[in-house]
Amino acid sequence: MKKCWFIVVLCAGIFFGCRSLGISVLGVRQHYDDLSKEEQALVVWTQPEEFMEHVVNDGRIYAITGKQLRIMIEKSHRALLYAWNPICKSEKCVSLEYLQRACNEQSVELYVIVDYFFGAFSQNTELTDHPLFVKNSEVYGTDRCEQLSKMFLVDLLGNLIYNENTETIWYRYIYFEDGKFVKTMREPSIIVQ
């Protein structure tokens, strides 16, 4: 028991020590300020009422709300939302090119929401049919990833679907049919067979 408390105190000390020294902890926030000026110029901050359905993939990342994405998904027969972490090395995090090809073969629209900016521009942002999206921290009033995800998912799925106590909502893949939520998945198994 003492060992467990020691680990908790050590982790808390490291986390709060980093915060007080101004050291970023990757994944806690979006890291927009850490982008170069050239990369920041490639981020488009949209207005919540702006229609996004005709936006083409021009290599920029569009900051949107869950409601804006829901409007796009509602027009799709089958759609997959991938919460992409640009630096994830897990087998659950597949490449954008591979996933787009698999979705095309299955006639599924792929929408990619970037977890945070760090590493996003080191990839080819034009590998997907639709542009890459990011949760709009200006609209939601925070750049903290966990808070952003909660607010974004409520906008996307509605209060009836989203439940903080349901761990499956944090899976990387959300599948829709005829614009309606079907399920969340750890892997894109519905697409990649």
What are these regions (language model features)?
Residues 22, 119-122, 182-184:
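Short catalytic/ligand-binding loop motif for oxyanion handling, primarily in non-cytosolic enzymes
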